């Protein structure tokens, strides 16, 4: 029997009473010793600087709402925590919920006004969209498709590090899909741009929402076909082949980047394939 999901998205009526809520400000999400979900009625009594409110889904069967604040404030007995920390430390179902909430919050902040005429927009009831009456324009949450690929050569994997990475960490190659190209075209282009390597036998491995701030990661495995590694200036700090028995520090366990690496290690060793989170 398939275990029911703890978190499911939905567009809920913000005029309804009750439910739970998460609070997002410029310092992350509000939390206390019980977590990031609070009784909605209790939050309303705090008179927080709410910029917008959104009904976002159900967690363990309970309706959940999102309060987007104009700025973070001090709440007695609570603290603020960034989304990445929830991914690294907390319940993955909670991270999925907060990842969705973070993307809704980003969309709500960026589309308070119409990009065509500058007039204020309004939420459309029953739909995840903002609306400009003047231009008859609907504004939906942004999703940015991107690819991530593990390139392999026998018992070696090609890993690279960006100047933005934490010290010492290496990961698979990644990049955003350009208008007019397929995900597969993107993989070939990005690998060539970033390390000047040709690839073959592309295999789709799965996808993962990456809410930093609104990426949809499409994961691939590819085999090395030729070329010497030449890191892209300003984008790739270092790139090299690593033997599977001598790997550097890797991305977080819950990331698709780590999954691609672990899946290949399992394939080479004959171990069971890992499960892609989320």
Curated annotation (Swiss-Prot):
Motif Nudix box at which residues? Answer: 175-196
The source's superkingdom equals: Bacteria
Biological source species: Pseudomonas syringae pv. tomato (strain ATCC BAA-871 / DC3000)
The protein's GO terms of the molecular function aspect are: magnesium ion binding; manganese ion binding; NAD+ diphosphatase activity; NADH pyrophosphatase activity; RNA NAD-cap (NMN-forming) hydrolase activity; zinc ion binding
Question: Which residues of this UniProt protein bind a divalent metal cation 1?
Answer: 174, 194, 235
Residues bound to a divalent metal cation 3: 190, 194, 235
Cofactor stoichiometry and binding remark:
Divalent metal cations. Mg(2+) or Mn(2+). Binds 1 zinc ion per subunit.
Q: Which Pfam families match?
A: NUDIX (PF00293), NUDIX-like (PF09296), Zn_ribbon_NUD (PF09297)
The record ties this protein, via InterPro entries, to: NAD-cap_RNA_hydrolase_NudC, NADH_PPase-like_N, NudC-like_C, NUDIX_hydrolase-like_dom_sf, NUDIX_hydrolase_dom, RNA_Hydrolase_NudC, Znr_NADH_PPase
What is the name of this protein?
NAD-capped RNA hydrolase NudC
Tell me the name of the encoding gene: nudC
UniProt keywords, alphabetically: Hydrolase, Magnesium, Manganese, Metal-binding, NAD, Zinc
Source lineage: Bacteria, Pseudomonadati, Pseudomonadota, Gammaproteobacteria, Pseudomonadales
**Entry GO CC:** cytosol
Self-association and partners? Homodimer.
